């Protein structure tokens, strides 16, 4: 078994598990055992780009606010970009955030984030292990072109009750497990709930007590909840049943209510003469249930599963006002409601057999019915007692998808092994049928006892895309299914790598790769997303993308110290006929260089210290770097110096000039994370664990965007020579010390 230690950011190579490609990984907390055969697996496994995180590793990862996070652990891998710092984006080998498949005990989930992406939607206390694929996708997986994250729940305890309570800065969670019928039926359950709304309530009350004298009342609230349930029943030694339920939901409200507190000399809101309230409310989340039936055969396993999964998001923007509270006829409002949802009903049947460790067979059939509401938009107004409602009448779109696959893995000897598979998919939506074949293959050839060369190819299709108008991905971004106008997204990924074990307890992996992507979707330029008169298809345009790079990982273990260095090199391009005048442009997350350096020192059995440094080339954004003068333009994007006499009757203002899409690169992103783990034993015999960490220890303010300002140095003297432009970077995350405590019972 491989010994694995923890560091501030995990940098996994290509075999962190028995079915992955690197041997060891670095995490931040304590030494744990991970499924794997160590260096031997690094050389002999045919697959590439697979990483496995153990349950202990996931549960103990310290990140911002002391909350361990699966997705942020994956962000530290070479070839994986985080998007914006601190958020749970996953941009794998030039792909986008919607191109990642997340399976929770086989249940497909969408948009797996809380608090706008600060936390992922997975309660790590309920997780057993995670298998992550960024290349050589097995044929049993499909539907997303960039990565697969397959999350397995902890098995419940059939013999005794137990659990743990974890407390962090912003939330707490509880995990319990135990038998219902000892030895035959058992359950496990997890509950995680944020207490941001509870902690902020006293502060909000104090602020409103102060601002009500000025006729203002602030509206603010946020909470998220996760619930997980697993029920297992052993029918006999060969047959078992399993039911898993998942629920994760967020609610956010933000607004301001203004009222007249002076007209009547009162600070009581009910006594005011008028009010004007603006509010925004956002809710999003996933819920679902899956039932699995397992039947153990002589040489293999047969599994059948049925599931239901739904994701939805709702955004409401409202303004209510009344000029005279004594006169109901003066009440008016304007409201906008945007919604989108996906509901899946599916069934799976799979078979796996292992023949003497020489030949492994996997085969199966999947079916899914997808029900989409791509864009529900309702605008309503009440003016002068007359109500007006605008509805885009967006129809539900239903698709049926059937897939069949076969995976074959052969190990001829210690020198050669290969895996070959094929997946066939038929998707029918709105009268259009798409039939696609997806070949998958990988090969390993050993070069002596300590080196091997691997190569892989995978084609995969995606039948729904999420299109964003923002710099970060939001839960309100719409999921768009394929149609007669927009074909399925297709990716071809080519990989080749060298793997080796070196003297001095050192091992490495180097992978070169190229990815080709067709039928990407983006919003058209100059189109209003909230226009109810345009069908969602008319707002989009289709194009292509390609990316290529090299991923490198080197790890060495010396005594109590383990160190890992990872490096990723990436080029990421897009080309749309209707965007950027048809000229290719770099993608938002064209992060050229990425470095992770991690070290862990185990002082003794109770205390461990960790440090990790991360460097990433900055993201890209579209920014006007020039202005030009347009006489008579009254509302330009930004002013620019006019000719002599500007400011008199011949006023001239300027308009922003955009040279190209994603033309500016943000400054490089780097930070240092430090951590310490302390294990304790209580008098009652129960164990506990403190996790103390410092995120961004030297407080480097990494830029998330750039703002353009126009400044006149001389007040009330708008002379041409005094005007100049400035560009300011905006940052979000400073140094964040945090802690968490886990109590085991």
Locate the predicted segments by residue:
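Surface-exposed extracellular loop regions of Gram-negative outer-membrane beta-barrel proteins
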Residues: 262, 312-314, 449-494, 514-537, ...
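Gram-negative outer-membrane beta-barrel transporters
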Residues: 514-516, 534, 538-625
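Outer membrane beta-barrel strand-and-loop segments of large Gram-negative receptors
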Residues: 336, 340, 344-348, 392-398, ...
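Periplasmic N-terminal accessory/gating domains of Gram-negative outer-membrane beta-barrel systems
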Residues: 33-35, 44-98, 106-137, 154
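C-terminal beta-signal and adjacent terminal beta-strands/loops
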Residues: 198-199, 606, 615-652, 667-671, ...
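Structural signature of Gram-negative outer-membrane beta-barrels, strongest in the C-terminal barrel
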Residues: 342-344, 352-362, 366, 393-517, ...
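Flexible loop and strand-edge segments within Gram-negative outer membrane beta-barrel domains
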Residues: 240-296, 302, 310-341, 474-475
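Transmembrane beta-barrel wall of Gram-negative outer-membrane proteins
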Residues: 170-194, 210-255, 281-301, 308, ...
